[in-house]
Amino acid sequence: MSGPAAKGWCPSLFAPMRAADGWLVRVKPPGGALSVACAKCVAGAAERFGNGTIELTSRANLQVRGLADEGIGPFAAAIVGAGLADPDPEREARRRVIHPPLAGADPAAARDAGRLAAEIEAALAGDPGLADLPAKFTVAVDGGGGLTLGGTGADVVVAWVDGRWLAAPAGADGGAEVADAEAVVRLARAFLEVSGRCAARPRRMRALVGAIGSAALFAAAELDRVAEMEPRAKPQAIGWLAYGDGRRGAFGLGLPFGTMSAATLAGIAAIAVEWGDGSLRLTPWRAMALPGVEAAEAPALAAKAARLGLIADPSDPRRAVTACIGRAGCAAAAVDARADAAMLLRRGLKIAVHVSGCSKGCGQVEAAPVTLVGEDGRYGIVRDGRAGDAPSVRGLTMAEAIGLLEAGP
């Protein structure tokens, strides 16, 4: 592998990003799942070649921090050797699918959800004509069941609706029927073609649909809109997730601030062996789902997870506050986001807050009720928006921001 080139946005396994704590790389497990052996491989490689910190991203990828220059190549080799990445860097970069978390486990989900997601990912990866897709362009395959993929911010959503698969570009109110991966590839190609003709080229599908309308995009893709598609809500991804007759299910474990140590990942793998089916399913909500858990064993699993510092209770107050890594790991950050987020937790605010180190908003895809945006060592407040939106108030210390939030709207 040639020497790394610094990136400022969306790292991958073969295109690391320089951060304040070393190089940052992403691992995209095939099918969105880790076997116990693969989890141990990632944990071991993160400890050996990085600083042992692993994050779970909003696209259900793993992000490993703190790699030294000399560790980038060996880390990538370990991940490829474990079957967790395509050895071709260009194909790996085009693997852009958020997989249905409980495919093959939840009987209420579409039976072919995992197969279709894999086919779509292979088709995107195998099409060199899609090399110019923006780094954040993502497809979500939602097979229904207990863990739907609502609120992922994906550019194309492929969903199981009333007994058939529909594909909808973000911002559209309807979808085209999907028989195989071809419809999704057509939408991706149409995005490139149509956005390339715009004076100010949109970087996301929602912006393009907002500019030209979904009918024009479907026409460019040579697809027919056949049915309405209602956006699905973000599911409850933490705690006991029953399926079938309720005697078995999955258990969702959240990561505080989406971060864990290599030792914690190994601990989750041990839990999956002891109580589940041995697989760790990644979700886009900074949580992992462990399928194959007996309902009677769920309390023991939750207790073990709590001892590891994981979020096992849907009412855990740590779920309400999210934060990017901030100055501790990002040179672009203007504030120590996670330390300040911990201060918010101690105050027990009854509102969901995202703390962003800067206006890029890497740590939060969707809008939040409140976003605190770092600016020159202080904070701006964005309500019902994203970090890149204009703050209604600027120049606040964290204490001042907390005071305003405690005072109410």
State the predicted function of each range.
Residues 158-235, 382, 389-393, 408-409:
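An acidic, glycine-/histidine-flanked metal-binding catalytic module
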Residues 3-18:
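Intrinsic, low-complexity N-terminal interaction/targeting segments
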Residues 12-16, 238-243, 311-312:
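Short beta-strand/turn micro-motifs at beta-sheet edges
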Residues 2-3, 19-168, 172-182, 186, ...:
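Small-residue-enriched alpha-helical segments and adjacent helix-cap loops
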Residues 347, 377-389:
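Short microdomains enriched in Cys/His and/or Lys/Arg
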Residues 230-250:
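Active-site cores of enzymes that catalyze phosphoryl transfer or operate on phosphate-rich substrates
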Residues 128-129, 389-409:
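Short flanking/linker segments adjacent to small metal-binding domains or redox-active Cys/His motifs
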